[in-house]
Amino acid sequence: MWTAGNIIIGGLITGSIYALLAVGYSLVFSVSGALNLAQGAFVALGALVMYSFTNNAHLPIGAAFLASLCVVGAAVGLIEWVVIRRAVTRISHASLLMMMGGLLTAFEGAAYLIWGANPFSFNSFSGTQPVTVGKLSIPTQGFWVIGAMLASVAVLSWLLSRSRWGRGLRATSENMTAARLMGVPVDRMILLSFIAAAVLGVIGGAVIAPLTSLDYTSMASYTNEGLIAVSLGGLGSVYGSLAGGLALGVVEAVVSGYVSSLFSTAISLIVLIGIIFLRPQGLLGRVRGGRMDVAERVAGRIYAPPKLPYRWLASGGITLAVVMLFMPQIIPGGDMRAVNITGLFCLTIVGLDLLTGIAGQVSLGQAGFMAIGGYTSAILAVNYGVPTLVGLVAGACGSALVAVVLGVVCGRLRGMYLAIITLAFGILVEALANGLNITGGPSGIAGIPPFSVAGFAFDTDTRMFYLVWVLVAVALVLSANLVRSNRGRILRAMHSDQVGAQSLGLHITRAKVGVFVISACMASTSGSLYASYFRYLSPDQVGSAQSLTFITMLAIGGMGTLFGPLLGVALLTYLPLVSQSFANYSMLVTGVLLVVFLRYLPAGVWGGVLEGVTLARTRWAGRTAISGRPRAAGPDAVSSSPGEATPPGEVTAASELTVPGEGTSTGEAAADGGGHAGAPTLEVRGLSKSFGGVAAVRDVSFTVSDGSLTALIGPNGAGKSTVFNLVTNLYRPDSGEVILRGRPVTGLRPDRITSLGLFRTFQTARVFPQLSVLDNVLVGGYRLGRAGYLAQSLRLRRCRREETQMEARARRLLSVFGLAGRADERAAVLPLAGQKYLELARALMARPGVVLFDEPAAGMNDAETAELGMILRAIRDTGHTVVVVEHNMSLVMGVCDQVVVMDAGRVIAAGSPQAVQTDPVVISAYFGAAEANT
């Protein structure tokens, strides 16, 4: 009992430091939305600065503490002003998180250069004799730790609730834009939050230093512990952070006391992953959600490899192959090892670029898959005599299984939470490698045999060179094929807008699992070859710090460019290996480069080259602007020149919308026997939905007949778009059901609903801005392609045939909507009307049975609206069932067969346009009771 009490007291002391870290995390996140991965650096930095003031300047401990507060606070304030402030509103949360990781690495590198690798500690503030209560032994320094934590949290709580600055911080955390409009100095609030977090870190470092030793490696350790604590308790909750920190300290102490200290972190990480999977906001945190029908901010560009002529590719490939063939004779023997290590990391980085750069799934634990592959093959070879090739395959299979689990866990997570999961995964693998006997613990595994195939050993630098770089070339070719394929487009669409991609039929979890598996297998192969090349493997070689280095390599070369990150690998791998002086600065340089590229050069080196090439081609072509209006469709619609003007008012040919000879719509194919004119296609029965106690939709019911054009109208705030979100299951209804062609679809995933033939557009044009206009439409036809990842990576004949057919259909649809001349431009440059037409074309690409158009005329002038009306009629006339939410009454009354009117979340009228226009209840809803009685 007394032993357990001492363990718990030790856990509370350590947990108090974790609580201070977690509160700092929570404060910065609440105000700025940034997950400050440099928080742990403030603890070690504060203690190290104090040590310098006490030992070099001979200041008293109190004066040294105040001086440390000033130095660290000023440094953090300067960094916030120069780097972070504008990044908060200009880059995505995921990029911001990676940038904060770069700051942590920069702090580590600076601390290493200033204080070296030797750990430092202080004497206890009040002696070394513990206080004993019965058999409980409490270190006197523990009272300082717990007291400092309680006092800091109490003062912070008082300031947040009672002071003017506290009110400003709380207002900014609730709504940054609204706070700015109301005169709150938001930039100062962000600065204040970072300085306050730094102060909390310095306080923690000052009181914990007498109990433990601190050095530059402590920064990452405390960052990880604080992140676990705040994720457990709840981001944005001071008291949740306090509870999470104390609980984490106690759990780790109990595991260390009764199991092993080597497993305390691993068990905490497993708990963290489980909690984030079940409740991402933490145990006491609250959901910081937004509207699911409004796209999130995405930073940077998403590139597809340029489609070069085959002769160029063949000539370039042959030239490169010849150069690589003779490179071992050119490169000095001492540098071959550096070149081979560069190649091994290139193999990992190609997979990481697919995962993070192309698919947008930020992975801060990629080295974990290298560790799984390396340790699996090493253990099998050393302990059981298994051939290294079999070990490599086993490692890849093991990594694939872990990637499946990780992909499923991450399937429901986005942005920051996904990054936390992958970071926790990388740290977990490192912790297990350090703690398990079979891995050799911190000492690692030695005596690993060289990689061999059928008795041929790759036991020299030259042989390994050819093996590694052939694998890199194969990985690049397969990845480039995949990115240009149907699957690759959907991965890029998922990166641009996950909810938008899901609304087009993408199974998010399945897509994430697929790309995680591909990326993991590449990293695992690299890890296996890495272990056999060095004949040795230890946890620090494939630890979590290496994962952040991979992210830096990616950022330098250019995320999503495939070839660009190889430049980053060469810079950060080759130079430190051939230059010892550069190696001493590698951490600092790595961190600074990651911050600079993510903040100021998000396209990276190769991305900048592609930007320049694109700009030069555009200017050289002298392309003129196109109106973006739909052209008259007829026999010549497909071949019309891009700049040709079209007389407005001509009816779009129905044949162009159905694309002759390509089968029936998805909805018709999904229906049992198809529908017939006038039969109910879509039935909404008693739908209700409330948000925070406010009823947005109340008992809404209506029926849409097959082949009809129905409008859903009503004043602003009537609940029309919410009904669309309920029908497509972006929101789960509180009650009621939706019937599609006689089948209940309430509760089905959005991708399942689209597979049944129901597609939608959004109130705010939700195109994929970083994709080309043509690719946007092709994404809409994602389900028309049947080939899988492997077939499309190999570009089999059936894949090429599918691609040709889909592209032909997409170009015909673009011609119908007047966008054929802009097919290769980014969708972001289209005017609002052009983006609305692009959404219509994308929805029709999949041959839907039912289409929901949410305010398609928004932002259009009268001529464009008239043309839109003709398009809507043409879509209906081809057999599609159309439902529109629209405020333009001239358009609604001129083209619709049925009008459903909503007000205050209820249906108040339904019928023909003529009947609705004369309904007193409708007139009252729009113009008031007095007008209705006249």
Task: Mark where each language-model region is.
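Transmembrane alpha-helices
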Residues: 15-25, 180, 184-208, 220, ...
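Transmembrane alpha-helices and adjacent helix-loop boundaries
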Residues: 94-118, 134, 187, 262-264, ...
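Short, non-helical or kinked segments that cap or interrupt transmembrane helices
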Residues: 25-47, 61, 90-95, 165-168, ...
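Glycine-rich phosphate-binding loops of nucleotide-dependent enzymes
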Residues: 34-37, 170, 175, 675-683, ...
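Membrane-helix/interface signature in polytopic inner-membrane proteins
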Residues: 156-194, 219, 477-515, 822-824
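Hydrophobic alpha-helical segments within and immediately flanking transmembrane helices
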Residues: 14-27, 35-55, 75, 79, ...
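ABC-family P-loop ATPase nucleotide-binding domain
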Residues: 295-299, 303, 610-688, 930-934
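Conserved N-terminal flank of the Walker A/P-loop in ABC nucleotide-binding domains
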Residues: 23, 180, 350, 499-502, ...
